[in-house]
């Protein structure tokens, strides 16, 4: 018997597992580094949190964000980052998260689909590929995926999120 308030764990770890899918690092060529993995995790979390806010589930979205920060903090500690360096690193992660959130939500709220796709390509080039234009095709793949993932997430209930399957949109 699972308590309803524990759903944020199920949702967060489902998103973590989706973000580890090799498609992002092989087909889309996102660097398989800490920063690259963080970009893909944030992509999924921001889209999910956007849905939760629209569904008026702010408490659940905040619980997921809190869990993400706790998980990243723990990862730093497990990597041997010193206690004095953790706050500075976490501040940077927070700035990245809230900056990406604002940017990505603005892009996803764009009504013109061609403009949205173009903005997403620029977003991914800048953030996932360090503005290296030789990755434009990969940024295009990520933008198509992001739009498909938004469609997938928007059309399911909260209870279905922990069973999300991205196979159909890869």
Give, region by region, the residue ranges found by the protein language model.
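Surface/interface-facing alpha-helical segments and adjacent flexible terminal/loop regions used
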Residues: 1-170
């Amino acid at each position: 018997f699972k308590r309803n308030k524990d759903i944020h764990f199920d949702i967060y770890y489902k998103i973590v597992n989706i973000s580890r899918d090799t498609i992002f690092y092989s087909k889309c060529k996102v660097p398989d580094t800490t920063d690259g993995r963080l970009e893909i995790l944030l992509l999924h979390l921001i889209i999910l949190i956007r849905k939760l806010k629209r569904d008026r589930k702010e408490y659940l979205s905040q619980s997921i964000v809190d869990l993400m920060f706790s998980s990243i903090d723990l990862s730093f500690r497990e990597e041997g980052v010193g206690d004095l360096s953790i706050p500075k690193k976490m501040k940077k992660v927070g700035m990245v998260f809230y900056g990406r959130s604002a940017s990505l939500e603005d892009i996803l709220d764009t009504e013109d689909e061609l403009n949205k796709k173009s903005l997403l390509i620029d977003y991914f080039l800048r953030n996932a590929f360090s503005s290296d234009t030789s990755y434009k095709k990969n940024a295009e793949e990520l933008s198509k995926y992001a739009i498909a993932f938004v469609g997938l997430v928007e059309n399911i209930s909260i209870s279905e999120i922990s069973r999300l399957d991205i196979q159909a949109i890869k």
